[in-house]
């Protein structure tokens, strides 16, 4: 059980610039993991296993990509009670991301806006960090944490050459991932969301599917591939994406990323900042996409629901909308690690 009341830490962190607070937190987690300091945020892992895409998830609550872009804190995050952790987004080459300031809190709406732009240390450093994780080397028996590795393209790579970056990343992370997520939905890399369009998505997923089969044959292991999509899609676009996912044998979908809409935060400080909005205002838009995906994909296609979970009830709403498992990120910032267990127990109690 966590020894540190998160309200105390949050009061201190919220007095800082949002990105500076994030970096301080990640440094603390990286230094404290695998030491007695880890008890400050340690929580029991709720047992609520589910089989999806050939994987056994220990429970239905995971960490969304974006918090730990460089895979520095896997062991620390595992101690919070997550059933699965997704790290990244990683790109082939290191890149600084967009100019600062680029992360903003909207506390009145329990939300964040970021335009980080896939800032990361690159594929080689990312893989080295994954390999250092003790959770990955030791495992946890039947309750082994699952690890998702989230891949993207470099900002300097022309959109017409994006497939090359995704294939490079897929090959690099493949031996180390329980599943891979293809991120085509961040609003903070120019033209990236164009990859969600019919022809572009068809070409990209076709190439990824082909390369995955080559890697599976060479390594004797078929790693599931998920695709992360945006909430800013109409029903026709969701239907096209669903068809394309199935046509190319993708194993699941992550719904959704951040939104570029600002309807729910108009008039608030920082509401006009460019970037992706996450947190409570995204819940209903994300759930709507999940419902549309479930209707289009049928009852068995795996859906990871993410977007706007700040309470156990929010997590349950994702499951009721059609998600099989859920992920949190902004909720962790506002509510702290205890949210993981509360959400996992509420979902378990649905049974």
Curated annotation (Swiss-Prot):
HAMAP family reported for this sequence: DHO_dh_type2
GO biological processes: 'de novo' pyrimidine nucleobase biosynthetic process; 'de novo' UMP biosynthetic process
Binding residue positions for substrate: 69, 114-118, 183, 188, 257-258
Function: Catalyzes the conversion of dihydroorotate to orotate with quinone as electron acceptor.
Location relative to the cell: Cell membrane
NCBIfam families referenced in this protein's UniProt entry, alphabetically: PRK05286.1-1, PRK05286.1-2, PRK05286.1-4, PRK05286.2-5, pyrD_sub2
Catalytic activity from the UniProt record: (S)-dihydroorotate + a quinone = orotate + a quinol
Family statement drawn from the similarity comment of this UniProt entry: Belongs to the dihydroorotate dehydrogenase family. Type 2 subfamily.
Residues involved in FMN binding: 65-69, 89, 150, 183, 228, 256, 279, 308, 329-330
Organism placement in taxonomy: Bacteria, Pseudomonadati, Pseudomonadota, Betaproteobacteria, Burkholderiales
GO molecular function terms attached to this record: dihydroorotate dehydrogenase (quinone) activity
Complexes and interactors: Monomer.
Pfam name, any one: DHO_dh
EC number(s) stated in the UniProt entry for this protein: 1.3.5.2
Required cofactor(s): FMN
Annotated InterPro entries: Aldolase_TIM, DHO_dehydrogenase, Dihydroorotate_DH_1_2, Dihydroorotate_DH_2, Dihydroorotate_DH_cat, Dihydroorotate_DH_CS
Enzyme type, top EC level: oxidoreductase
Cofactor comment: Binds 1 FMN per subunit.
Membrane topology annotation: Peripheral membrane protein
Active-site positions on this chain: 186 (nucleophile)
Pathway listed: Pyrimidine metabolism; UMP biosynthesis via de novo pathway; orotate from (S)-dihydroorotate (quinone route): step 1/1
This protein's name: Dihydroorotate dehydrogenase (quinone)
Matching Gene3D superfamilies: Aldolase class I
An example Gene Ontology CC term for this record: cytoplasm
């Amino acid at each position: 059980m966590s020894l540190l009341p998160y309200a105390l830490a949050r009061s201190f962190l919220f007095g800082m610039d949002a990105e500076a607070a994030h970096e301080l937190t990640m440094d603390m987690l990286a230094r404290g993991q695998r030491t007695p300091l880890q008890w400050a945020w340690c929580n029991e892992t709720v047992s609520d296993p589910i089989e999806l895409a050939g994987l056994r998830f220990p429970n239905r609550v995971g960490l969304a990509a974006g918090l730990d872009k460089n895979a520095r804190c896997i062991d620390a995050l595992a101690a919070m009670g997550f059933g699965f952790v997704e790290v990244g987004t990683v790109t082939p080459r290191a890149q600084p991301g967009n100019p600062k300031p680029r992360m903003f809190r909207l506390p009145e709406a329990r939300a964040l806006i970021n335009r980080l732009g896939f800032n990361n240390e690159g594929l080689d450093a990312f893989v080295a960090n994954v390999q250092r994780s003790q959770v990955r080397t030791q495992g946890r028996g039947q309750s082994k944490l699952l690890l998702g590795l989230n891949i993207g393209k470099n900002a300097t790579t022309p959109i017409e050459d994006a497939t090359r970056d995704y294939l490079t990343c897929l090959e690099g992370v493949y031996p180390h991932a329980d599943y891979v997520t293809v991120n085509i939905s961040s609003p903070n890399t120019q033209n990236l969301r164009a990859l969600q369009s019919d022809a572009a998505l068809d070409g990209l997923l076709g190439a990824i599917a082909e390369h995955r089969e080559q890697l599976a044959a060479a390594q004797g292991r078929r790693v599931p591939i998920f695709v992360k999509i945006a909430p800013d899609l109409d029903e026709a676009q969701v239907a096209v994406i669903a068809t394309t996912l199935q046509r190319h044998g993708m194993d699941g979908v992550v719904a959704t990323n951040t939104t570029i809409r600002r309807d729910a935060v108009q008039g608030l400080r920082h509401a006009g900042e460019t970037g992706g909005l996450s947190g409570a205002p995204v819940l209903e838009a994300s759930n709507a996409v999940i419902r549309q995906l479930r209707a289009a994909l049928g009852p068995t296609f795996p859906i990871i629901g993410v977007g706007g979970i700040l309470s156990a009830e929010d997590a349950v709403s994702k499951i009721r909308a059609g998600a099989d498992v859920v992920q949190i990120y902004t909720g962790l910032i506002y509510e702290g690690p205890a949210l993981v267990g509360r959400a996992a127990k509420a979902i378990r109690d649905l049974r």
